[in-house]
């Protein structure tokens, strides 16, 4: 379901009902008796035929769009069991951990399964995702959800990794990427040595809301031999592109002059009317009623109006000139968590590089060879001295 796309909606499929940008509801299709009720009306499942289609309600009061599920859209519509990892963070984490088709990934803290769907797609059918959850109820719900969504490369495990580690009986994990979403990740870091692939570079990311957690995790990573430690905080803003009507200075000046002229004309007419009413003795109520009718009639004419003020104009109308502009959100999305990254060098790499990722001196990398070379050099230096004697 999440690893491949299709056009036709079948019985038992998952459909995301898109109502608004902030209202997306998951629907498990039941063709015979299913009915999706919203404030826009009722939508029978039997009418759900194609992904991407627009479906009208039975009462003709509104419509929804039938969207194919993706990890990004599932993040916006899933039932929350815990705090989740949103796409802003998950996309960056996948890139930093270098998760790709065929990767073996460890995830500790399954929670609502938001990030699990993202890394399952990135690892592909050739990869494996070992997901650990210590809370039994959340583990059972997540396991059922993964089975319904056909995430066949996800292996969920019920375990407290902080105390019991990551080992799985009869399985050699050999992970190259690790994601820890735990209250105390520093207690789980020492257990990683047994389950990461030491023949290549392994990478870890700790997802921690509090800075104190980051400090303790950094200490644990350093003690366990991890290098290239870096903390990142992702702050995202949404940019919206649209068309805006062009307004020249000459048009603005002409518009202001026209408004001023019409104001002066209106004031002159009003003064003349008051003078006539005073001379003729017309009653005030009749005068007010006549003024209301006249203002209503004259309001339809706005004089010089180059930008269609007061009119309903469709964006991009060829009667006006437009330019493309981008507008940023006023507020940055609030802080979610700190992302702590680190790398574990392969065994060969540890012989070449130190903890600061600097190349070790040759004498440290090959102590035996360097000792033999030093002895040979000493003998070569002493030999001519004996000859001269």
From Swiss-Prot:
Region listing for Disordered, in residue ranges: 278-313, 364-389
EC number: 2.1.1.220
Keyword field contains Cell inner membrane: no
Subcellular location: Nucleus
GO molecular function: tRNA (adenine(58)-N1)-methyltransferase activity
A Pfam family the protein falls into: GCD14
Main location: nucleus
A GO cellular component annotation in the UniProt record: tRNA (m1A) methyltransferase complex
Comp. bias (Basic and acidic residues): 290-301
Lineage: superkingdom: Eukaryota
GO BP annotations, alphabetical order: tRNA methylation
Residue ranges, compositional bias (Acidic residues): 280-289
Keyword Transferase found: yes
InterPro entries: SAM-dependent_MTases_sf (IPR029063), TRM61_C (IPR049470), tRNA_MeTrfase_Gcd14 (IPR014816)
Key words, A-Z: Methyltransferase, Nucleus, S-adenosyl-L-methionine, Transferase, tRNA processing
Sequence similarity: Belongs to the class I-like SAM-binding methyltransferase superfamily. TRM61 family.
Assembly and interaction partners: Heterotetramer; composed of two copies of TRM6 and two copies of TRM61.
Function (record text): Catalytic subunit of tRNA (adenine-N(1)-)-methyltransferase, which catalyzes the formation of N(1)-methyladenine at position 58 (m1A58) in initiator methionyl-tRNA.
Protein's name according to its UniProt entry: tRNA (adenine(58)-N(1))-methyltransferase catalytic subunit TRM61
Natural source organism: Yarrowia lipolytica (strain CLIB 122 / E 150)
């Amino acid at each position: 379901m999440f690893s491949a796309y299709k056009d036709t909606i079948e019985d038992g499929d998952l459909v995301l009902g898109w109502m608004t940008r902030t209202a997306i509801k998951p629907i498990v299709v039941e063709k015979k008796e299913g009915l999706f009720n919203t404030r826009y009306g009722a939508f029978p499942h039997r009418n759900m035929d194609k992904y991407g289609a627009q479906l009208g309600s039975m009462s003709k009061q509104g419509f929804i769009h039938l969207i194919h599920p993706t990890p990004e859209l599932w993040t916006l519509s899933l039932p929350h069991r815990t705090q989740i990892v949103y796409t802003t963070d998950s996309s960056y984490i996948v890139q930093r951990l270098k998760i790709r088709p065929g990767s073996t990934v460890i995830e500790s803290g399954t929670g609502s399964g938001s990030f699990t769907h993202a890394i399952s797609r990135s690892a592909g059918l050739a990869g494996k995702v070992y997901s650990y959850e210590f809370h039994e109820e959340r583990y059972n719900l997540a396991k059922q959800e993964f089975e319904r969504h056909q995430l066949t490369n996800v292996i969920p495990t019920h375990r407290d990794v902080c105390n019991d580690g990551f080992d799985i009986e009869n399985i050699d994990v050999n992970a190259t990427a690790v994601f820890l979403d735990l209250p105390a990740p520093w207690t789980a870091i020492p257990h990683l040595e047994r389950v990461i692939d030491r023949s290549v570079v392994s990478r870890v990311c700790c997802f921690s809301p509090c800075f104190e957690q980051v400090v303790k995790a950094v200490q644990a990573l350093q003690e366990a031999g991890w290098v290239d430690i870096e903390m990142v905080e992702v702050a995202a803003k949404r940019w919206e592109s649209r068309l805006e009507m062009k307004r020249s200075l000459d048009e603005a000046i002409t518009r202001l002059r026209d408004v001023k002229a019409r104001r002066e004309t209106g004031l002159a007419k009003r003064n003349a009317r008051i003078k006539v009413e005073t001379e003729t003795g017309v009653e005030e109520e009749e005068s007010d009623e006549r003024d209301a009718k006249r203002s209503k009639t004259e309001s339809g004419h706005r004089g010089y109006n180059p930008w269609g003020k007061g009119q309903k104009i469709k964006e991009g109308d060829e009667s006006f000139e437009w330019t493309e502009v981008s507008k940023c959100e006023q507020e940055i999305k609030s802080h979610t968590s700190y992302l702590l990254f680190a790398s574990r060098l392969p065994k060969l790499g540890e012989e070449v590089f130190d903890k600061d990722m600097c190349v070790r001196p040759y004498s440290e990398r090959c102590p035996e060879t360097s000792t033999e070379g030093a002895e040979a050099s000493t003998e070569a230096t002493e030999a001519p001295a004996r000859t001269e004697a």
